[in-house]
Amino acid sequence: MSRRDTSQHHLTCSFCGKSQDEVKKLIAGPAVYICDECIELCNDIIAEEIRMEDALGPDVTKLPKPKEIKEFLDEYVIGQETAKKVLSVAVYNHYKRIERPAKPGDVEMQKSNILILGPTGSGKTLLAQTLARMLKVPFAIADATNLTEAGYVGEDVENIILSLLQAADYDVERAQKGIVYIDEIDKIARKAESPSLTRDVSGEGVQQALLKIIEGTVASIPPKGGRKHPQQEFLKVDTSNILFICGGAFAGLDGVIQQRIGKKTLGFGADVKKKLEKKAGELLLQVTPEDLLKYGYIPEFIGRLPMLASLTELDEDALVQILTEPKNALTKQYQKLFDMEGVRLRFTDGALVSIAKEALKRNTGARGLRAILEGAMLDIMYEIPSQNTVREVVISEDVIYHKERPLLVYEQSASSAVA
């Protein structure tokens, strides 16, 4: 029941009792009133409860099973079936290990950090992002090419944890159960198989620096970034339960694998050349730790990334599927934008195939699809908001290949077609 000051006829908040003169806003409900201060307090209580739930990380009793994780990945990532299974199992085991820590005398379970190998635009980053979104954990992306050993010009590896802290709004508990994706990890391989006597700022040195945070350490993280603010207080972050996913294209690794396979087949008198004529993507599926060692990684670094997932190159059919099938497919995003203007957007089958072929020609994989679409759609997206009579836009292969204008269906034409 609402409270009223009968002498002054002033309304009061049903929860704190303050009058309408004491608060900025008083909102009326069925026989009750609530002030802006009580609303803000309720929001703070709810936000704190949500924050506490997030800080606990994924509940093992509610943790999705590997099949459920893969089904979620299927909604956003086309193909790459084996890699999705590897990731689903690794992520499930990782968070199960966190929620059920080993007791004294128990078998200690190794951390399931993951190494993803695959060509540009095959879905490495998307897989990691989708996993983090499903599990509702903080997520950060780092570029290995920007990393150097401490004391050299470039980013310290601790900045990776700083990015994760920022994604967790500086909540250390949440950050300690987050996911980090390190891209271009192939770029920090040693340039030669034998150890160098000189300092390798971008190779073995970075591997050694990354090794500590990947395997698990208590890192001292400067909240404002390291070198420019030497006097600041440090945050202590335990990286033992952070899942690290490293990815790269690994150009040239197929040659290392091919050489190993070739040596095994030479003694059997087989047609070696024919056996070795395989696509790079197929060869990456056969990668072993020994191949990575020969490629330029130190044994300790390989040992901290026990789960290997190889992605295959995307063909034309897969790229067409990527354009249309995932929940957030590019064509669906554009159709939503046009729908906001009251216009239907349609892509012909020929247009979809043309976009896929152009991406293959550019050798950019799925990553290049957006750039191709944006180039084709720029002019029409510029014009449509100013044209009130357009009801449908049709994108054909000529729009993609020959830069022709899309077919526009106007209101009168649409009405005639219905009649």
From Swiss-Prot:
One Pfam assignment: ClpB_D2-small
InterPro entries, A to Z: AAA+_ATPase, ATP-dep_Clp_protease_ClpX, ATPase_AAA_core, Clp_ATPase_C, Clp_protease_ATP-bd_su_ClpX, ClpX_bact, P-loop_NTPase, Znf_CppX_C4
CDD domains: RecA-like_ClpX (cd19497)
MF GO annotations: ATP binding; ATP hydrolysis activity; ATP-dependent protein folding chaperone; protein dimerization activity; unfolded protein binding; zinc ion binding
Biological process terms in GO annotation: cell division; proteolysis involved in protein catabolic process
Gene3D superfamilies: 1.10.8.60, ClpX chaperone, C4-type zinc finger domain, P-loop containing nucleotide triphosphate hydrolases
Domain ClpX-type ZB per the UniProt entry, residue ranges: 1-54
Residues annotated for Zn(2+) binding in this entry: C13, C16, C35, C38
GO cellular component, one term: HslUV protease complex
Keywords: ATP-binding, Chaperone, Metal-binding, Nucleotide-binding, Zinc
Residues involved in ATP binding: P119, T120, G121, S122, G123, K124, T125, L126
Metal-binding as UniProt keyword: yes
Function according to Swiss-Prot or TrEMBL: ATP-dependent specificity component of the Clp protease. It directs the protease to specific substrates. Can perform chaperone functions in the absence of ClpP.
PANTHER family: ATP-DEPENDENT CLP PROTEASE ATP-BINDING SUBUNIT CLPX-LIKE, MITOCHONDRIAL, ATP-DEPENDENT CLP PROTEASE ATP-BINDING SUBUNIT CLPX-LIKE, MITOCHONDRIAL-RELATED
HAMAP family (UniProt xref): ClpX
Entry similarity comment: Belongs to the ClpX chaperone family.
Oligomer status and interactors: Component of the ClpX-ClpP complex. Forms a hexameric ring that, in the presence of ATP, binds to fourteen ClpP subunits assembled into a disk-like structure with a central cavity, resembling the structure of eukaryotic proteasomes.
Name of the molecule in the record: ATP-dependent Clp protease ATP-binding subunit ClpX
Organism: Trichlorobacter lovleyi (strain ATCC BAA-1151 / DSM 17278 / SZ)
